């Protein structure tokens, strides 16, 4: 771990004083979050450029979470991967089995943890945005940078909340008093997306192109553009999805497509934004890799997906570098090895949140939906070329092209941040794909239940269809 990384993680000032509660732990209920910080405490955290920077660094730490907290690192990837079909669960934990069999109960503690942790992060970013906007003592350029970072984190968090739960309460920087009482009802998905897009557009305006530091652990203008491209794709606004993806893809001085073997190292040119960790060992590696010759990995790539990687005339380099067959007894398990660092002695990987390949695939899908099949093919082929395989056929129809993009997204993004789950939901393909392999699948399973603990704390929260408290 380099010295800059140590400074990033170790020199954060006491955030519990500034933000009115720990950034590193989350409470299960809004009513347990504690009293909001006073105006004096806000000012204490934002009197100087250095102290304000430290508060924002704390938001990144909070977003990363821990190996057992479902913030925006690998635990969220696990739960969505189990709910979809890009992860096979080989364990027996009852709460995880509920995700894997799409039999979630509203009392599932992990579902409640996701909600509570993400809303704790919303609270922290709201407090930061409010304090930053009220501050008169910060250097204007730094103030803009920090507001942009906080709004990016808030938008990213809401993007997960709305795609996991559907309509969710919308708390902003102006709602700090209401937030503590947890009295707001669910807000429409459309309105939440308006806030997401507004935050990201403001962030893109305020953030600079240059990264703060060398390891891309803080967002820049292109990170905001990349997330805007994703959000617009999810909203089926293909004009803007293509526009913002193109902005990122045009930054060839910053971003490149390295070999799959190095895509996830923390100096990779593909990385647009990554969440740092203390020793360069990700919870992805800890969860996906099983140590010991006879240890069965808890989470693996299903055999049916492994068999869809191309092998002729050339073998897909993603299959060779990101999946490792492991035989235990008479059964073969396909271990996900995108992240390979399992020891601090190596310590060269962080949690990659945004990377360039996704932007090619976003633009390909946007172009295909706008009848630009030639442009879509060019973008898919850019991803396939990095994987060492031939381009797709030039004779595909729009429907065939979209199917090819779905497959390419699976091969490229499996096991990462819920991409497969969200893809199947937003394209209305969840039932067609999951019903044949999920015996208990129901169409209402596309949303997680609103946690019963949250409904007890706030009786204005309605339950999603298909669930009971």
Model-assigned labels for residue ranges:
Residues 53, 61, 93-165, 205-212, ...:
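Conserved, well-structured interaction surfaces
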Residues 96, 242-356, 412, 438, ...:
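Hydrophobic-face positions in mid-chain alpha helices that act as interaction patches
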Residues 2, 26-27, 195, 284, ...:
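Long, intrinsically disordered, low-complexity segments
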Residues 2-6, 12, 23-78, 460-469:
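Acidic, glycine-rich segments characteristic of secretory precursors and extracytoplasmic regions
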Residues 40-42, 70-91, 208-288, 392-399:
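Short, surface-exposed recognition loops and adjoining beta-strand edges that mediate ligand/DNA contacts
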